[in-house]
């Protein structure tokens, strides 16, 4: 069996702010905490990193800062999605230029391309930049769902190496494992179902929860990847309430509240994301107690 290019837990990093600006010192500290906690990679400027409200300059700077801070200790998969193919190519090209190990490219949102349009989008990126690409399929946010048939076609392209699957459809993992080739990387994009996803052959998760609990998430994934399902299930039971609580309000507000409570960064977000509600805060704190974080 071939080892996948990426595996384990890769936190979908928040982008901390202070007084409306990216807090670079806090971001560096968060990256160092993740690496010390044993995570297997880093994913800056994705959904949880509020990429939608970063300027292009900020987006590029956060990727550069992540790569510089990681210093090759773990791989960096840079968020580089856009509903404009030309813009996505530019973001992927920048990720390659600054030394990222791969790019995470979300399916084009809002303009709702056909399945053939989705294939053409990723084919164009594949042809333009020599950097490994992970397809990010999250239809609840994009209103498009890339089909297994298109993914099989994409798996034949040299630079499209795998997927972040946030559909919660576990059968997709089995299908892709059987039809996309043994080098195809399969990462869940949904913490609560990652255990089942890995049981179907997935290799890990791009995780929101790891922002708050890197050591615990790393232990969970190490157990699952080694086939110790009993220990992995114990970790699942300990973390599942936190998985849910971090989406008790619009993400990443609950995650930033949790990090603020731990003294790691401000809970500041950018509009239209507002701070977590009092009910969400209470739910997050209860979940953090369950997980042994406070």
UniProtKB/Swiss-Prot annotation:
Pyruvate binds at residues 48, 206. Catalyzes the condensation of (S)-aspartate-beta-semialdehyde [(S)-ASA] and pyruvate to 4-hydroxy-tetrahydrodipicolinate (HTPA). It holds the Pfam family DHDPS. The record marks 47, 110 as: Part of a proton relay during catalysis. Its EC number is 4.3.3.7. The active site is at residues 136, 164. Homotetramer; dimer of dimers. It comes from Phenylobacterium zucineum (strain HLK1). It is an enzyme of class 4 (lyase). One of its GO terms (cellular component) is cytosol. It catalyses: L-aspartate 4-semialdehyde + pyruvate = (2S,4S)-4-hydroxy-2,3,4,5-tetrahydrodipicolinate + H2O + H(+). The keyword Cytoplasm applies. It comes from the Bacteria. This is 4-hydroxy-tetrahydrodipicolinate synthase.
């Amino acid at each position: 069996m071939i080892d996948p290019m990426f595996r384990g837990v890769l936190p979908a990093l928040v982008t901390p702010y202070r007084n409306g600006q990216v807090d670079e010192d806090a971001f560096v500290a968060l990256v160092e905490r993740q690496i010390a906690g044993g995570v297997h990679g880093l994913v800056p400027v994705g959904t949880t990193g509020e990429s939608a409200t970063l300027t292009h300059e900020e987006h590029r700077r956060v990727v550069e800062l992540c790569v510089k801070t990681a210093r090759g200790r773990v791989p960096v998969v840079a968020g580089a999605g856009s509903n404009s193919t030309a813009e996505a190519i530019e973001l992927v090209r920048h990720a390659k230029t600054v030394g990222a190990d791969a790019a995470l490219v979300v399916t084009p949102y809002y303009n709702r391309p056909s399945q053939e349009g989705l294939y053409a989008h990723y084919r164009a990126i594949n042809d333009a930049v020599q950097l490994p690409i992970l397809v990010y399929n999250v239809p609840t946010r994009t209103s498009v769902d890339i089909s297994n048939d298109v993914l099989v076609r994409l798996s034949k392209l040299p630079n499209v190496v795998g997927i972040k699957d946030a559909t919660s459809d576990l059968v997709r993992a089995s299908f892709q494992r059987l039809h996309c080739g043994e080098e195809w990387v399969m990462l869940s994009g949904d913490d609560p179902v990652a255990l089942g996803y890995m049981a179907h052959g997935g290799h890990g998760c791009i995780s929101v929860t790891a922002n708050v609990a890197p050591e615990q998430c790393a232990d969970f994934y190490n157990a699952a990847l080694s086939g110790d399902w009993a220990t992995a299930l114990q970790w699942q039971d300990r973390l599942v309430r936190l998985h849910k609580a971090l989406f008790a309000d619009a993400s990443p507000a609950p995650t930033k509240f949790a990090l603020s409570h731990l003294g790691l960064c401000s809970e500041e977000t950018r509009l239209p994301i507002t701070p977590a509600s009092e009910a969400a805060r209470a739910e997050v704190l209860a979940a953090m107690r369950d997980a042994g974080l406070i």
